[in-house]
Amino acid sequence: MLTIDTTIEWLGKFNEKIQENKAYLSELDGPIGDGDHGANMARGMSETMKALEVSNFGNVSEIFKKVAMTLMSKVGGASGPLYGSAFLAMSKTAIETLDTSELIYAGLEAIQKRGKAQVGEKTMVDIWSAFLNDLQTDSASKDNLEKVVKASAGLLATKGRASYLGERSIGHIDPGTQSSAYLFETLLEVVA
């Protein structure tokens, strides 16, 4: 279960993972997007960490709300609104429960509502849904996350910028799926 300290630790680890993989995320985004997913996420998480360092929080909900507001205002493209919506929904859920499955469910619902995407459309919904299922069946692991990331390459994009490529979107890993994998890998490191 998340606490104030473990939540901040999780976000710090996620930031490190994003910074380390900034170029790779943008490389993934190049063929099927604007090529800026890594730069956008790195900037957003850097700003998020700055915001967390200068704030005092009474609960996990307040942390998630700060993350949401920062990502929505600092991350360009679709990633800011999608991740921001997820963290905002998680902040509302965290008022009632800190159950990891419930938090991820809230985030997934918000992403689906914002992006109007379903499972199988080569979006971050695929990995959020798979991770939620794994949490609910006590089978969440880094290996399972990596399988979902790799499987995204075989999907036809029907949402977002990648959908403009049609069949040419097949064969490319979805960058939002990869960045979400980093989010969940680092969560597992903290709550395991």
Curated annotation (Swiss-Prot):
<feature type="binding site">
    <location>
        <position position="29"/>
    </location>
    <ligand>
        <name>Mg(2+)</name>
    </ligand>
</feature>
<comment type="subunit">
    <text>Homodimer. The dihydroxyacetone kinase complex is composed of a homodimer of DhaM, a homodimer of DhaK and the subunit DhaL.</text>
</comment>
<feature type="binding site">
    <location>
        <begin position="78"/>
        <end position="79"/>
    </location>
    <ligand>
        <name>ADP</name>
    </ligand>
</feature>
<protein>
    <recommendedName>
        <fullName>PTS-dependent dihydroxyacetone kinase, ADP-binding subunit DhaL</fullName>
        <ecNumber>2.7.1.121</ecNumber>
    </recommendedName>
</protein>
<keyword id="KW-0067">ATP-binding</keyword>
<feature type="binding site">
    <location>
        <begin position="174"/>
        <end position="176"/>
    </location>
    <ligand>
        <name>ADP</name>
    </ligand>
</feature>
<dbReference type="InterPro" id="IPR050861">
    <property type="entry name" value="Dihydroxyacetone_Kinase"/>
</dbReference>
<dbReference type="InterPro" id="IPR012737">
    <property type="entry name" value="DhaK_L_YcgS"/>
</dbReference>
<keyword id="KW-0963">Cytoplasm</keyword>
<keyword id="KW-0460">Magnesium</keyword>
<comment type="pathway">
    <text>Polyol metabolism; glycerol degradation.</text>
</comment>
<dbReference type="GO" id="GO:0005829">
    <property type="term" value="C:cytosol"/>
</dbReference>
<keyword id="KW-0319">Glycerol metabolism</keyword>
<feature type="binding site">
    <location>
        <position position="36"/>
    </location>
    <ligand>
        <name>Mg(2+)</name>
    </ligand>
</feature>
<dbReference type="GO" id="GO:0000287">
    <property type="term" value="F:magnesium ion binding"/>
</dbReference>
<feature type="binding site">
    <location>
        <position position="161"/>
    </location>
    <ligand>
        <name>ADP</name>
    </ligand>
</feature>
<feature type="binding site">
    <location>
        <position position="34"/>
    </location>
    <ligand>
        <name>Mg(2+)</name>
    </ligand>
</feature>
<feature type="binding site">
    <location>
        <begin position="37"/>
        <end position="40"/>
    </location>
    <ligand>
        <name>ADP</name>
    </ligand>
</feature>
<keyword id="KW-0479">Metal-binding</keyword>
<dbReference type="InterPro" id="IPR004007">
    <property type="entry name" value="DhaL_dom"/>
</dbReference>
<keyword id="KW-0808">Transferase</keyword>
<keyword id="KW-0418">Kinase</keyword>
<feature type="binding site">
    <location>
        <position position="124"/>
    </location>
    <ligand>
        <name>ADP</name>
    </ligand>
</feature>
<feature type="domain" description="DhaL">
    <location>
        <begin position="5"/>
        <end position="189"/>
    </location>
</feature>
<dbReference type="InterPro" id="IPR036117">
    <property type="entry name" value="DhaL_dom_sf"/>
</dbReference>
<dbReference type="GO" id="GO:0005524">
    <property type="term" value="F:ATP binding"/>
</dbReference>
<feature type="binding site">
    <location>
        <position position="115"/>
    </location>
    <ligand>
        <name>ADP</name>
    </ligand>
</feature>
<dbReference type="GO" id="GO:0004371">
    <property type="term" value="F:glycerone kinase activity"/>
</dbReference>
<dbReference type="Pfam" id="PF02734">
    <property type="entry name" value="Dak2"/>
</dbReference>
<comment type="function">
    <text>ADP-binding subunit of the dihydroxyacetone kinase, which is responsible for the phosphoenolpyruvate (PEP)-dependent phosphorylation of dihydroxyacetone. DhaL-ADP is converted to DhaL-ATP via a phosphoryl group transfer from DhaM and transmits it to dihydroxyacetone binds to DhaK.</text>
</comment>
<dbReference type="GO" id="GO:0019563">
    <property type="term" value="P:glycerol catabolic process"/>
</dbReference>
<dbReference type="GO" id="GO:0047324">
    <property type="term" value="F:phosphoenolpyruvate-glycerone phosphotransferase activity"/>
</dbReference>
<keyword id="KW-0547">Nucleotide-binding</keyword>
